């Protein structure tokens, strides 16, 4: 499905008022729904990657390595936009890092690339399914249940059968 480019006029009075309102609300009480939608307000290109690509492609069916006390959200951005993203997250007072380091609460872990490959799943820009599967296979021990879900949902013919072992 073709996507239209979105242009955000940051000088628009309505945009300024809404941004001020949103900043105040998010700074005090960022929830997961808001966090996953927040990058859309940047007007910059990005894609959910890593654990979040798996989370999105499994439609929330598989989530790992996070808790209510520490919830990283993984995105990839264009290298040329790094300073703009830093300003964006700082402006919204949202925690972020360019390496995977534990922080409290909801925060973004950002990787950079010269170009971004993306597909859309549930209207969210995400690492393409094939690349997500390749990534998950590198960490098969952690993602075997997710690989089985993806195989079943998208008929990938991976032949993955996850089985829990009890000692």
Give the positions of each predicted feature.
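Generic structural signal for residues positioned in beta-strands
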Residues: 5, 72-74, 132
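Alpha-helix boundary/capping detector
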Residues: 14-17, 32, 159-162
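Short secondary-structure transition/capping segments
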Residues: 15, 44-54, 148-156
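Hydrophobic alpha-helical interaction segments
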Residues: 79, 83-167
């Amino acid at each position: 499905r073709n996507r239209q480019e979105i242009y955000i006029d940051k000088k628009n009075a309505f945009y300024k008022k809404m941004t001020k309102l949103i900043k105040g609300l998010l700074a005090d009480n960022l929830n997961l729904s808001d966090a996953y939608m927040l990058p859309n307000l940047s007007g910059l290109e990005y894609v959910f990657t890593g654990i979040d690509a798996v989370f999105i492609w499994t439609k929330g069916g598989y989530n790992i390595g996070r808790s209510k006390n520490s919830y990283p959200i993984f995105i990839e951005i264009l290298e040329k936009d790094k300073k703009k993203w830093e300003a964006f997250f700082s402006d919204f007072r949202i925690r972020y890092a360019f390496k995977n380091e534990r922080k409290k609460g909801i925060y973004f872990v950002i990787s950079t690339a010269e170009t971004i490959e993306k597909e859309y799943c549930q209207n969210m820009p995400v690492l393409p399914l094939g690349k997500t599967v390749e990534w998950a296979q590198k960490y098969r021990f952690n993602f075997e249940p997710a690989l089985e879900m993806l195989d079943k949902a998208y008929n990938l013919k991976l032949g993955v059968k996850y089985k829990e072992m009890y000692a």
